[in-house]
């Protein structure tokens, strides 16, 4: 999902990538728990 937004004009790509990683980490943590 994050790869669909590729405009480093204002660094939005970085934000989307961080959000995607954050969701994945939360999912992993939830599965682990």
UniProtKB/Swiss-Prot annotation:
The keyword Transmembrane applies. Signal peptide: none annotated. One of its GO terms (cellular component) is endoplasmic reticulum membrane. It is a multi-pass membrane protein. Keywords: Chaperone, Endoplasmic reticulum, Membrane, Protein transport, Transmembrane, Transport. Pancreas. The keyword Nucleotide-binding does not apply. GO terms for biological process: post-translational protein targeting to membrane, translocation. It is found in: Endoplasmic reticulum membrane. The ER translocon complex consists of channel-forming core components SEC61A1, SEC61B and SEC61G and different auxiliary components such as SEC62 and SEC63. Mediates cotranslational and post-translational transport of certain precursor polypeptides across endoplasmic reticulum (ER). Proposed to play an auxiliary role in recognition of precursors with short and apolar signal peptides. May cooperate with SEC62 and HSPA5/BiP to facilitate targeting of small presecretory proteins into the SEC61 channel-forming translocon complex, triggering channel opening for polypeptide translocation to the ER lumen. Required for efficient PKD1/Polycystin-1 biogenesis and trafficking to the plasma membrane of the primary cilia. This is Translocation protein SEC63 homolog. The gene is SEC63.
């Amino acid at each position: 999902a994050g790869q669909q937004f590729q405009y480093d004009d204002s660094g939005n790509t970085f934000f989307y990538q961080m959000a995607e990683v954050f969701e994945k980490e939360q999912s992993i943590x939830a599965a682990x728990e």
